[in-house]
Design a protein with these regions (language model features):
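Catalytic cysteine-centered active loop of the rhodanese-like fold, especially the PTP/DSP P-loop
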Residues: 55-99
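Flexible, polar/low-complexity N-terminal or interdomain linker segments that lie immediately upstream
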Residues: 1-34, 106-116
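Mobile, glycine- and charge-enriched loop segments
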Residues: 18, 23, 45-67
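Charged, elongated alpha-helical/coil segments that serve as electrostatic interaction surfaces
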Residues: 84-87, 96-116
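A generic "binding-loop/recognition-motif" signal
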Residues: 30, 48, 94
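Short hydrophobic/aromatic-enriched beta-strand-loop microsegments
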Residues: 42-48, 86-90
Length: 116
């Protein structure tokens, strides 16, 4: 099935975070990848069943994974829409795009910057 996917840009995600908008930013990669680095404010969801349990159908949801070629966020988007979630968007650029912009990350693999 071909989806007309709702996308959100890097700058729009950053604006939503800066404004402290009420939305669920969901990283759909492995637990290891999430612990290594993720966008601040993200939650990790490992399975479709966990998504259904932790997300309400009327939540404002943004799913992302590693980058433009990562299919995990496409699959998560399609799964949620198929299950009646009405406010789902995909941040296609993911971690790679976010990091290239110099935006902050959290996690065990994030280098701490020294501001001297």
């Amino acid at each position: 099935m071909k989806w007309n996917m709702n996308l959100i840009s890097r700058d729009d995600v950053k604006t939503k975070l800066d404004r402290k908008d009420s939305f669920k930013l969901v990283m759909v990669l492995s637990e290891w990848a999430y612990r290594s680095k993720h966008i601040p404010g993200s939650m990790h969801i490992a399975t479709p069943e966990e998504a259904l349990a932790r997300l309400a159908k009327d939540d404002d949801i943004v799913v992302y994974c590693s980058g433009y070629n990562c299919i995990a966020s496409v699959n998560a988007y399609e799964y949620l829409v198929r299950h009646g979630y009405t406010h789902v968007r995909r941040y296609a650029g993911g971690i790679i795009d976010w990091e290239e912009a110099g935006y902050p990350l959290e996690g065990e693999m994030v280098r701490e910057e020294t501001n001297a």
